[in-house]
């Protein structure tokens, strides 16, 4: 094919199109790979998979590559986190936005930085709802069981091409909060890696 230009458009829920980037040059014969993502479908997917893991009493672990996919994977990660801790965002979403919390940055940013910017009562309320979500949801896979760092603490802590081979070698298991391995539902929401 001939050299050409492409653009990236966003279509909102009302059908209004906004050009996000135009003038992307493609060389003759160059191949472009693109995808469309539905936020609603993604969030429904996470909810369904979390519920299934809870019903089957297995861990849940998220596997992405936010270090390389610097736009899409942190956003996907943010939705994984905000669905898991949905009660927190339902009650304190506006207050968390006021202290510039973005779930794409992980749970550690909330716990270690943003909570300090909330008043004491709200900070305690957020912590309480986090604990309620931990109790209501399936157990989360751990990056570091000794330090209490879950799979949702940092978007770049679970790199799919390192984490999934470890899960496969462990017969489909991942580390739990006590440092032992347990059967896990490995969620790979990025289609680039989902064929694993």
Region roles according to the model:
Residues 1-78, 87-196:
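Extended, well-ordered protein cores
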